[in-house]
Amino acid sequence: MLTFMASDSEEEVCDERTSLMSAESPTPRSCQEGRQGPEDGENTAQWRSQENEEDGEEDPDRYVCSGVPGRPPGLEEELTLKYGAKHVIMLFVPVTLCMIVVVATIKSVRFYTEKNGQLIYTPFTEDTPSVGQRLLNSVLNTLIMISVIVVMTIFLVVLYKYRCYKFIHGWLIMSSLMLLFLFTYIYLGEVLKTYNVAMDYPTLLLTVWNFGAVGMVCIHWKGPLVLQQAYLIMISALMALVFIKYLPEWSAWVILGAISVYDLVAVLCPKGPLRMLVETAQERNEPIFPALIYSSAMVWTVGMAKLDPSSQGALQLPYDPEMEEDSYDSFGEPSYPEVFEPPLTGYPGEELEEEEERGVKLGLGDFIFYSVLVGKAAATGSGDWNTTLACFVAILIGLCLTLLLLAVFKKALPALPISITFGLIFYFSTDNLVRPFMDTLASHQLYI
């Protein structure tokens, strides 16, 4: 699921523009001059309107703090073009890193390509000589897997709808504990074994403990944004590696196709579970749990920047380390550092509102299934690099098209259908057409 974070308030555009600037960027001219007093503000406004009438031009700063609701023509498009491309790139980087971690592990660590077990959600084996029976078993495994995903998603939405925040947090914390401690222990042990690196158990356990403890703090409490993003990428890669190892080959491809269809239905249907989850969060003005969503931008507020009270006109609270960064409390409510504005003369009762920085949110499930597709392409069959790179490029193309549609429709969209469809088409076409062609050229020593 792919969503776009944007400010809903149009009463004070000054906050939206300054929240996207650096901490040391100067305040716009209209903001500084318009707060001097009622007489100065009126004189400034009259002088500016006369100047604009004489020049025949429109001052864009007049819309910043003039109290006029709405934006000047073209400002919304300018902000979308300026900051939209940046966040697209910021989303490409983590997706690429997650897939690189998975492919590098598949190519180097044999543990994740050895088939010595299956998930309990895929009980039907594919070790049968009959193609029809193998296809039937893969379809049955897919039906069971998708049913489990649907039931758990609906269960999560019901819990969220009835505000069972503590239960959801406990559920997510237990999942994170298993990923950050158990799966990390297995992963690190296999990597050390592959590269023949000796390490005693106390050191290994201490390393896993430090890694997991820091991850739990960053994901479920507060920490640097970059560190939180790195942990979300890592747990997505670990989960993808588990699916690659324990999902049967044919079942994995059928599940990828089915999950993209389910994602389409769950997000776009009026009563789809993911759509209901997003709409409920928007109605309550609450963030979706950070353990489920990767965000290219956190909820940065004006209180986090190094403001100059003399130039900004703001009264900040004394420094408190616990309020340095925005975080989420134990009930999922946003917790912001407070910045108080003194009442502006000439604007009774008007206060600057904290705005959310524009950004793109991508569900961790999308990271996982992107990596499963690329990892399966690297692990199954010939494991040809051409096939792996083709799937990688297909996923990025699909993600780019999804982001383009997101900019057009400006609502939550499923991120799996286009990318997974392109990935499956590129995989089977490359594996069955391009790879034999390249092998034939290589056998005849012909190079293009």
Curated annotation (Swiss-Prot):
Pfam families, per database record: Presenilin
Residue numbers bearing the Phosphoserine modification: 22, 25, 30
Catalytic residues as annotated in Swiss-Prot or TrEMBL: 263, 366
Post-translational modification: Heterogeneous proteolytic processing generates N-terminal and C-terminal fragments. Phosphorylated on serine residues.
Keyword NADP tagged: no
Membrane topology: Multi-pass membrane protein
Region feature (Disordered): 1-70
Any one of the GO CC terms: synaptic vesicle
GO biological process: amyloid precursor protein catabolic process; amyloid-beta formation; calcium ion homeostasis; intracellular signal transduction; membrane protein ectodomain proteolysis; mitochondrion-endoplasmic reticulum membrane tethering; Notch receptor processing; Notch signaling pathway
EC number: 3.4.23.-
Residue ranges of the motif PAL: 414-416
Location in the cell: Endoplasmic reticulum membrane; Golgi apparatus membrane
Outcome of swapping residue 263 to A: Reduces production of amyloid-beta in APP processing
GO molecular function terms attached to this record: aspartic endopeptidase activity, intramembrane cleaving
All ranges on the Lumenal side of the membrane: 109-138, 188-200, 245-249, 383-388
Annotated TM spans: 88-108, 139-159, 167-187, 201-221, 224-244, 250-270, 362-382, 389-409
Intramembrane intervals: 414-434
Disorder this protein is connected to according to its UniProt record: Alzheimer disease 4: A familial early-onset form of Alzheimer disease. Alzheimer disease is a neurodegenerative disorder characterized by progressive dementia, loss of cognitive abilities, and deposition of fibrillar amyloid proteins as intraneuronal neurofibrillary tangles, extracellular amyloid plaques and vascular amyloid deposits. The major constituents of these plaques are neurotoxic amyloid-beta protein 40 and amyloid-beta protein 42, that are produced by the proteolysis of the transmembrane APP protein. Cardiomyopathy, dilated, 1V: A disorder characterized by ventricular dilation and impaired systolic function, resulting in congestive heart failure and arrhythmia. Patients are at risk of premature death.
The protein's role, per its UniProt record: Probable catalytic subunit of the gamma-secretase complex, an endoprotease complex that catalyzes the intramembrane cleavage of integral membrane proteins such as Notch receptors and APP (amyloid-beta precursor protein). Requires the other members of the gamma-secretase complex to have a protease activity. May play a role in intracellular signaling and gene expression or in linking chromatin to the nuclear membrane. May function in the cytoplasmic partitioning of proteins.
Protein's name according to its UniProt entry: Presenilin-2
